[in-house]
Amino acid sequence: MIFRYWGATTDEINSSVVGDDLCADATLIATRSITISALPQDVFPWIRQMGFGRAGWYSYDWLDNLGRKSATRVHEEWQSVNSGDKVPSGPISFTAAIVDAPRHFVLEIKSFGKQSPKLHFTLAYELREDPQGTRLVTRMRSHIKLPFGSLFERFILGPGDGIMLRRQLLTINKHASPFSKGER
């Protein structure tokens, strides 16, 4: 699958990430990582403010933000997302399952039955201290219990998420770096 382990080390791929237990029966798992020349507390606000109608997703705005440009600075008014809050993603919303600033931010979607969901998706952002600043490790996990769910994961969700998340990580790196033109 394209970009399934983009930027991730073998240790990052094989280690656990906060939120792995939320979608423990995942049939698709992807780990993507990037090193950012900024401290975790300077990177985390960029992640916390994400969402449709908020800062956007820092990816291909024409696709995941209906053409509205993603934020190029940190907005204080979008820094109040806490565990249990909704994070809009267009017609549906994620739940901020885990928010532990400035280390962890985990988004989750569960639908079609809370006990045994037909669709379960998590996206974890783990900010690890690094000699160069921050190592941002992401982990996407999904399980789709619908007809052709595994085909959808393999040929659409996996590659699509890989392309979009790669762009997101590069954009966060660009904005959060102290040498970027993004404003703090």
What is the predicted role of each segment?
Residues 1-77, 175-184:
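Hydrophobic ligand-binding cavity/cleft-lining segments
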Residues 13, 112-167, 172-174, 183:
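Beta-strand/loop substructures that line and gate deep hydrophobic ligand-binding cavities in soluble
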Residues 23-25, 84-87, 115-117:
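Short Gly/Pro-enriched turn/cap motifs at secondary-structure boundaries
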Residues 29-31, 90-92, 118-124:
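Short, surface-exposed coil-to-beta transition loops
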Residues 37-41, 97-103, 126-135, 174-181:
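A short, structured loop/turn motif at beta-sheet edges
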Residues 38, 42-45, 91, 122, ...:
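Short, well-structured alpha-helical interface segments that form or flank functional binding sites
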Residues 75-92:
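Glycine-centered loop/turn motifs
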